[in-house]
């Protein structure tokens, strides 16, 4: 991408031992998939240890996390549908991977990920349709983003 970069950024994912070694050997960043803050912390720690062994570094702010969110509550059909998807795909509890509530709940989850070592985030809105997803995204931009910037200072 422009401007021309000496090294193409390569963010890798995965939490297995081979994925951790690959990230340490080749990555310029790491992006969690559906891991919780409690699951992310040991992976980031293991990557950092593997980086020492590889005599490499990854910028301290090149560790990412992801979760789905909904300004609303767990009883809403859109949230129930998302929870069923996570349950079916992961065969694990969906609650730690979804935040349904208000700005405070979303910010609390971001803060948990920051405490675990993540500093970049992919937040996926849960919605019934395109209009709903746009509305959820707008709320995130207006209500959460300004506060997240404060968390990172």
PLM features per residue range, with description:
Residues 1-153:
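Active-site-adjacent structural elements that line small-molecule/cofactor binding pockets in enzymes
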